[in-house]
Each structure stands twice: as C-alpha cells, then as structure tokens.
C-alpha cells in the first residue's frame, strides 16, 4: 500500500506544481508505520482508542531515532493529522484512493459485506478539494461498480 501510494504521488506530481511533492512522498512512506506495532485495522473498524494506542507506540519508537529523523517524522505526522496544508490533503486523497484501487484489484471474496456500499462513497470528502482527485475518484467508482456488477 505505502509503496503504491509513493509511486502514485510521484506520477501525479505534475498535477500539483505548487505543492511540495517530496514532502507528500515522505508522508506516503511513513504514514502506516504505527501499524507495525498494532497491526492493520480496517478504517471502518478503527476506534479512537486504537488510534491513541498506535500513536503512543509510534511516538515511543520515534523517540529512539536520531533527533533529526524523529523531529521530521513527528512534524510530518502532525501535518498529516491536521490536514490543513495542500501536501497533507494530497497525501490523504492518495491514501484513500489507493485503498479503493486495492479493493478493485482484489477478488470480491476478500471484501467484507459493508465494503460493497462503502466503496461507492468512501473518500468523497478526502478528494473534494481537488478537481483532479474528484475526477479520479469518479473513475475509480466506475471501476468499483463494474466489478460488483460482474459478480
């Protein structure tokens, strides 16, 4: 997931000339490191308590890194969480859209029952800031519907 997100960010960098896409790529690389400690919990199952546990374990690990890396990563995580900068918004759109693409690639037997409806609307709010991402989301939705209809 992180690798494909990183490639995604690199390949669309021309679409966002005013954004620091190197920062977006760094966000893509590090965003799921906390899951190394907690496991991958699906977004629709993750609770605030899960998020807090993951954050605490991640911060404990970040504190073991050399200060320059720890500080940069903590800064990136804060920016991603606040989701106010163009880079953080681009990162979150990529994260959400890549997850949908993974679902469209995967066999329907791997989908949980709620994903059949969720995948039709998921990420709409994450892409609304960008015409480019909104159009891409619509193309991914079309692929989702085709996949469901074929089954």
Which residues does each predicted region cover?
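Active-site helical microenvironments for divalent-metal-assisted chemistry
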Residues: 1-151
């Amino acid at each position: 997931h992180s690798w494909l997100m990183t490639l995604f960010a690199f390949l669309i960098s021309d679409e966002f000339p005013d954004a620091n896409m190197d920062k977006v790529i760094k966000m893509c690389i590090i965003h799921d490191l906390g899951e190394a400690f907690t496991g991958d919990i699906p977004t629709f199952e993750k609770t605030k308590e899960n998020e807090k546990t993951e954050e605490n374990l991640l911060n404990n690990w970040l504190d073991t890194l050399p200060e320059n890396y720890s500080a940069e990563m903590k800064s990136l995580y804060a920016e991603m969480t606040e989701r106010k900068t163009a880079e953080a918004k681009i990162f979150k759109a990529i994260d959400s859209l890549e997850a949908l693409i993974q679902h469209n690639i995967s066999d329907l037997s791997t989908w949980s029952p709620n994903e059949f409806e969720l995948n039709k609307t998921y990420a709409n709010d994450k892409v609304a800031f960008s015409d480019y991402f909104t159009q891409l989301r619509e193309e991914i939705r079309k692929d989702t519907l085709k996949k469901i209809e074929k089954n």
